[in-house]
Amino acid sequence: MTTLDHVIATHQSEWVSFSEEPLFPTPLEGGTEEHFPGLSSSSDRSESSSGENHAVDEGSQDLSHSEQDDSSEKMGLISEAASPPGSPVQPTPDLASAISNWVQFEDDTPWSNTSAPHKETALTLTVPCWTCPSLDSLRRCPLASESSWTTHSEDTSSPSVAPSYTDLQLINAEEQASGRASGTDSTDNSSSLQEDEEVEMETISWWAGSPAMNGHPAVPQVTTARFPSWVTFEDNEVGCPSPTVPSPKKPNAPSAATAGPDVPFNSTGSFKRDRPKSTLMNLSKVQKLDISSLNRPPSVTEAPPWRATNPFLNESLQDIQPSPINPFSAFFEEQERRSQNSSISGTSGKSQRDSLIVIYQDAISFDDSGKSQSHPDAIEKLKQLQIDDPDPVGNAALPDDDPTASVEPDAPSPTSALSQPRDGWPMMLRIPEKKNIMSSRHWGPIYIKLTDSGYLQLYYEQGLEKPFREFKLEICHEVSEPRLQNYDENGRIHSLRIDRVTYKEKKKYQPKPAVAHAAEREQVIKLGTTNYDDFLSFIHAVQDRLMDLPVQSMDLSTVGLNYLEEEITVDIRDEFSGTVSKGDNQILQHHVLTRIHILSFLSGLAECRLGLNDILIKGNEIVSRQDIMPTTTTKWIKLHECRFHGCVDEDVFNSSRVILFNPLDACRFELMRFRTVFAEKTLPFTLRTAASINGAEVEVQSWLRMSPGFSSNRDPLTQVPCENVMVRYPVPSEWVKNFRRESVLGEKSLKAKVNRGASFGSAGASGSEPVMRVTLGTAKYEHAFNSIVWRINRLPDKNSASGHPHCFFCHLELGSDREVPSRFANHVNVEFSMPTTSASKAAVRSISVEDKPDVRKWVNYSAHYSYKVEIEQKKSLKPDFEGEDLENPKECGVQ
């Protein structure tokens, strides 16, 4: 008797053979069902060719007279184990029990041989599955856990004595097939996958048993043809249908008409290959990919079609409406004209997703394989593909400017520092100009004049004819950022520097190798003043003169200079100034000035083109794809009162609205400036200020809250904070002494207490000391502004909600009502900055550098706001305090 170990050792390479032959033998041409009982003689020839395993192979039968293989031994073995009691040869008890034990690895109870009826009313086919290794195992598609790739590729290099799960599927499928047909029928299942060869599978049809196997119902009728010879690993696969492809008939292939109604199979001819010399399973040798199999429409089955999940599909974006902006309209119009000349026929299925993927014949999509999309439909969808407009008409932002409208932006206020031409400015000069260890530096009063030719003249005092020093402004000069510096015992002073700046390319190695263009500053002069209006007026005058400097001839020493990294930086800065009404915070008057600065490092001579979102060129832009710059707005604006640097070709701008210029090498300069209309309906936050004077008591209170109508405040995730917020309350000169106190180091300004009671020491000569409270930031009197300054570093605060209000309160008791001046300042000054935003909505849409496509391009946006808010005059703030005691104010509650 053949033992189980001998059988396993003999057929260990046959358990995983990939079959290419039909599951059942092919009948002779012209034969009917009477031929099957008479074909038992072929089993004798099979027995004679396999003397090694005679006891196992004596029940196998081969219907093919020309093709014989060693795999008939395995099929005979399985046929004996699964044949009904009426079969000529019964399997040995040991072998049957061994196979039953294998099955118990899958289920707790052994399989029972279920005999299927020999006649069926309809021809059913098995569903091929790519995860099944052979045709014999196609009777049952494994579950998701069973079809895991780790089951097949656990250890392909070493043979295993224990039977694998793939062999159990093979035995299960053949056991069901032998039960339906007859116990004497067997098949030649010897063909296997070859290394680096394409497996050609022909159309196969056979009977499908009605009873369920392992709890899985039989699959509906499907025709398999040329299914791919590779293995894919996908879960939750119900079925992988493959279309029917007619194959050419061979001379010895029978026709469907010659087969009798009781013939349980009908297969066309196939060819046989030698068995590979390998161990149990070796799936590492993958066959060539057959792209054509992906494009065939699947057969209609009763099972629901399987559809993979698209990880890039966002269902929440289905309701987004298209935007009118389409930068590729010219391309699609040309494609549409070409497509009209030739008619393209195709059927397009209903797409189950809104995101567009053009499906080519060799592309794999996440939709059903039976649903296709024609090229014209894809082009039509691309034409409608539009970006969501961040500034729709329905929101608080203003629509595009009207190019035909005659509305001009408001002129600067007559009291503004921008509109007042000055002959000179009283300033303070830092002496000595350079630091010296042996001497101390101090501030000395001077008078400064700025000539039209760009000369800065310094006088000891106003009215002198001859300056004691004079120097000329150059294109490499820059004005530093304004800052506050210690001045005297009263407070600080506004200071600035005029520097000579040169940029050099330096290579850094830490923390990683990089090339940086560092600025080296050399101080030319340092000036200061305690008058903030004079300070701003002088800064704007110097900036205007630097922009009007004539362009010098090109330095030939820098023409041949080659930079390791070429780059160009564009800085857009908006300056907003205006007046806001009291109560409702409506903008009564505003002025928006936009400045564009350029800093470039380009080798040799380079001609640059800059494109803005000018309303006059809307729809007429012609730029290269690599020159398009990303923008955060789709608004188109109208430019007013444009002024240009000397390197800009104004004739080209007037004709094409494109800024054509030759940038200065390694020098930051102002390219142009223009005025626009404010692009928002509200300011970033609202400020309401009320003041009351009752005899000798003065009270001032402000409420600050973020404005929901501002575009940046609509989404908390993309909200841009206001930085360095200053709210200045002008203080009459008679009241300054009430806000000063003596200390060990001299007089200091009183500071506001945050959410706690105030105790400022002894009372002053004119009454009790003032009480100041704030809920956020700090507040104190600053002599540089002659005002009480409420400073907030960041608004909204990180620890508070966006809509949380903040409060400032000040209570002052004077010595008598005679100290109350007859006239008060009726405005509160507000000043702050916002990075990465634009008050004018001006945006750079394209930057082109001639013959330099690899130049690094940078665009920076910033906005600076400075405006006045009217103060509400009230007899008493008690209604606003909700009846609380004025002498013990607690209006600013704890957050």
Swiss-Prot record:
Residues 424-557 form the SHD domain. Residues 10-101, 144-204, 236-279, 291-326, 386-424 are annotated as: Disordered. SUPFAM superfamilies: Second domain of Mu2 adaptin subunit (ap50) of ap2 adaptor. GO terms for molecular function: clathrin adaptor activity. It comes from the Eukaryota. It holds the Pfam family Stonin2_N. Keywords: Cytoplasm, Endocytosis, Membrane, Phosphoprotein, Repeat, Synapse, Synaptosome, Ubl conjugation. The modification Phosphoserine is found at S278, S284, S299, S759. Residues 145-169, 179-193, 311-323 have a biased composition (Polar residues). The keyword Cytoplasm applies. A motif (NPF 2) lies at residues 326-328. GO terms for cellular component: AP-2 adaptor complex; clathrin-coated vesicle; cytosol; neuron projection; nucleolus; presynapse; synaptic vesicle. Residues 565-872 form the MHD domain. Its main location: other. Phosphorylated in vitro by PKD. GO terms for biological process: clathrin-dependent endocytosis; hematopoietic progenitor cell differentiation; regulation of endocytosis; synaptic vesicle endocytosis. A motif (NPF 1) lies at residues 310-312. It is found in: Synapse, Synaptosome; Cytoplasm; Membrane. Residues 64-73 have a biased composition (Basic and acidic residues). Belongs to the Stoned B family. Interacts with the second C2 domain of synaptotagmins SYT1 and SYT2. Interacts with EPS15, EPS15R and ITSN1. Interacts indirectly with the AP-2 adapter complex. Interacts with TOR1A and COPS4; the interaction controls STON2 protein stability. Adapter protein involved in endocytic machinery. Involved in the synaptic vesicle recycling. May facilitate clathrin-coated vesicle uncoating. This is Stonin-2. It comes from Rattus norvegicus.
